Amino acid sequence: LVGSEMCKETDYLTAAGEKVGVVKVRLYRPFCAQALIDAIPDTVKYINVLDRTKEPGAQGEPLYLDVVSALKGSKFDAVPVNGGRYGLGSKDTTPAQIVAVFNNADKERFTIGINDDVTNLSLELGAPLVTTPEGTINCKFWGLGADGTVGANKNSIKIIGDNTDMY
């Protein structure tokens, strides 16, 4: 996985007793195969690789292909490696979608985040899942560019940080 998705969901599931994990790729190129192999526990049963891109005409997405190549000939050579897409079309990735990936760990190819009516690879989702700690306040701001949103948000953050204990 490249990006910030999955961390809260993985913590949530492991706290509930599930045996799941995530490897976050922080530097993609050059790809370090040995670092990946070292990060995977010997008890792994499935490896699902999430790519935030679609490569039409390719055998798979970039990270998926690199993971398959890295594991070839290693002690994980027999572990199934499955590839999925997420975040296509700038769609947000929700906790329920991440849980669907874990619940469908044996599915060879999949898509989350969009209704994939072309390849029909979308995973079925369960009920919405809330992984945010109680008492957390979330805000989402949209800007159109040059409309002052960035400056207004900086000021809001300063006000909240200076005048409340919510930081």
Question: Where in the sequence are the language-model features?
Answer:
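Short acidic, glycine/serine/threonine-rich loops at helix termini
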Residues: 9-11, 33-35, 58-62, 92-97, ...
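Conserved phosphate/anionic-ligand binding catalytic regions in large, soluble enzymes, centered on
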Residues: 138-159
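Solvent-exposed alpha-helices and their adjacent loops that cap or buttress functional pockets
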Residues: 39-42, 74-76, 130-136, 161
